[in-house]
A protein has these predicted regions:
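Cleaved targeting-peptide boundary
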Residues: 35-42
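Sec-dependent N-terminal signal peptides
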Residues: 20-28
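Short, thiol/selenol-centered motifs that function as redox-active sites or metal-ligating centers
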Residues: 126-137, 144-145, 182-204
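C-terminal motif of bacterial Sec signal peptides marking the signal peptidase cleavage site
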Residues: 31-32
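Sequence context surrounding c-type heme c attachment/ligation sites in exported
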Residues: 207
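Mature extracytoplasmic/lumenal regions of exported proteins
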Residues: 178-200, 211-215, 219-293
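Non-globular targeting/processing and membrane-anchoring segments
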Residues: 42-174, 263-341
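Bacterial N-terminal signal peptides that target proteins for export
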Residues: 4-21
Length: 341
């Protein structure tokens, strides 16, 4: 049985299929049959031993004090960083008691009982939105994000100075303001904020948001995709602007479980079909739960036919708002639908 969740208040079921779909803020779909999707761990490219630097950097960007002897300890003593940290503490407390509390209540009420046995969460057109992906799918161990924005790089600690911290922290506030104030990233803002104005890509913001939301960064590795959809370590010396994908491993609070989010900088329109390596990688992971949130209605367009087809044919559940897959595809496809809003 397919299932879809939508936040608009409608729903449907077809016992011929064992799929789940959900439309977020418009509808939710859940799996209702006994057959389980095959699961497997995401393939891992061989990598060097993890370092503490990614977690140090994540905490620094998030306004959270790091190790006393860490590489950012002197910068954390500057007045601009301390003001940024204090302001962020207050803002975050408000979010936790406001919009995040509502999301958590929705997740517990509408999604917690949905068992899809999916291998991972697929979040196309995601930007760096690890916040809501983790909130809606708190038990997921693997996430695959994708979009046009560049991967980005982690600047070395030596590139920051006390003299530049006022400017740096103002930029960080700018970068995070959209997800905090609106609950989503605006495409037009990301186009310049994550192409040099704030960061040179999404990785720093992904780390910032993971750290602020109670996660520890275990490791960060850059990868490239082979034509047959396998991950390989990126060639040494690859310029930051040429990064194809990044893998971030993280833990939540005291939970020892290591979770993974991949971000792929790729064309998901015509490129999804013309360059099938990414689709092959997704297929190698098994079947996903799919999240589409603030997707600019791109999945309504003909140019995204291949991506939409992948979502409909492979997802066990789709959680989306009305910017995702057009509603008619679910009514015609025999999905179980729950709508909200």
């Amino acid at each position: 049985m397919k299932s879809e969740i939508d936040a608009g208040g409608r729903g449907f079921t077809n016992a011929r299929h064992c799929r789940l779909a959900a439309l977020l803020l418009v509808a939710v779909f859940t799996q209702a049959c006994g057959q389980h999707a095959a699961t497997q761990d995401p393939p891992k490219a061989k990598a060097a031993a993890p370092s503490q630097l990614p977690n140090d950097t994540a905490r620094f960007l998030a306004g959270l004090k790091g190790r006393p002897d860490g590489p950012y300890s002197k910068l954390e003593e500057t007045a601009p960083w301390q003001k940024y940290a204090k302001d962020f503490d207050g803002i975050w407390a408000g979010i936790e008691n406001g919009q995040f509390k509502k999301v958590d209540e929705f997740q517990q009420r509408e999604l917690a009982g949905t068992k899809t046995n999916s291998s991972f969460v697929f979040y196309p057109l995601s930007g760096p939105d690890v916040l809501y992906a983790n909130r809606f799918f708190p038990n997921a161990k693997g996430f695959v994000f994708a979009g046009l924005e560049p991967v980005g790089n982690l600047r070395p600690p030596s590139s920051y100075t006390p003299e530049t911290m006022d400017r740096e922290t103002r930029h960080w506030r700018l970068g995070v303001s959209s997800i905090i104030e609106r609950s989503f990233f605006v495409t037009s803002e990301m186009d310049h904020q994550f192409r040099g104005e704030v960061f040179d890509g999404l990785l720093p913001m992904i780390l910032l948001l993971l750290s602020r939301s109670g996660h520890t960064i275990v490791d960060v590795q850059y990868h490239k995709l082979t034509d047959d959809g396998k991950l390989e370590p990126e060639d040494p010396g690859t310029p930051p602007k040429k990064h194809q994908s990044v893998e971030v491993q993280f833990r939540r609070g005291e939970d020892p479980t290591v979770r993974t989010v991949y971000y792929f900088s790729r064309d998901l329109a015509a490129g999804f079909e013309k360059n099938p390596a990414f689709a092959r990688f997704l297929t190698s992971l098994g079947t996903p739960d799919t999240l589409v949130k603030s997707g600019s209605f791109l999945l309504h367009w003909q140019m995204c036919n291949a991506l939409r087809k992948y979502i409909l044919e492979n997802s066990n559940m789709v959680l989306q708002d009305d910017t995702g897959v057009p509603y008619a595809y679910f009514t015609k496809g025999g999905w179980d639908i729950r709508l909200f809003g």
